[in-house]
């Protein structure tokens, strides 16, 4: 019971073949090992819901599991996930492409998801325009990159107090379709 109160389990972490249970992941992405199938059944019964199934992520288990869970919790629909060199990540969302860069810890990652959801709300309300305005308060790493095909990429690092983007040649991320 203390485990459930302090560390809300949200997923079961498996190996690459979904054969061996590697542990249970909590909301913050921490992995708790040495969990038996019977304990998982008990947790699901007490929570009255099934836990997500997540495949193993080798040496970056905690960070990738946490990223996956934040994607599931995000208000913004995410259609594309582009993994760049290293651990840089770009999301294709309803509001455009959002470059997260390499994330350091869960608090930073949560903050970037907060700004992405805020951008999505502005887009949904029709408050994004042809100009780009980004006010920085903490980080010089936050920028808008208008690429060759004029696709705005919003880089959200630390703090963005205002931003507006939209362009005639904007390529919106396409929705994933079942094949």
Curated annotation (Swiss-Prot):
It comes from the Eukaryota. Keywords: Cyanelle, Plastid. It is found in: Plastid, Cyanelle. GO terms for cellular component: cyanelle. This is Uncharacterized 21.2 kDa protein in ycf23-apcF intergenic region.
């Amino acid at each position: 019971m203390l485990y459930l109160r302090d560390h809300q389990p949200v997923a079961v972490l498996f190996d690459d073949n979904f054969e061996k249970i590697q542990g249970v992941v909590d909301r913050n992405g921490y992995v708790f090992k040495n969990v038996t199938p019977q304990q998982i059944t008990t947790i699901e019964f007490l929570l009255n819901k099934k836990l997500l199934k997540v495949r193993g992520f080798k040496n970056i288990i905690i960070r990738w599991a946490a990223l996956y869970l934040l994607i599931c919790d995000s208000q913004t629909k995410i259609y594309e996930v582009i993994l760049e060199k290293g651990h840089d990540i770009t999301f294709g969302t309803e509001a455009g492409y959002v470059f997260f860069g390499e994330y350091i810890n869960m608090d930073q990652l949560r903050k970037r998801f907060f700004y992405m959801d805020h951008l999505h709300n502005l887009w949904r309300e029709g408050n994004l325009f042809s100009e780009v305005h980004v006010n920085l308060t903490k980080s010089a790493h936050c920028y808008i990159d208008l690429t060759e095909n004029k696709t705005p990429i919003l880089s959200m690092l630390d703090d963005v107090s205002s931003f507006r983007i939209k362009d005639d040649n904007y390529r919106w991320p396409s929705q994933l379709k079942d094949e």
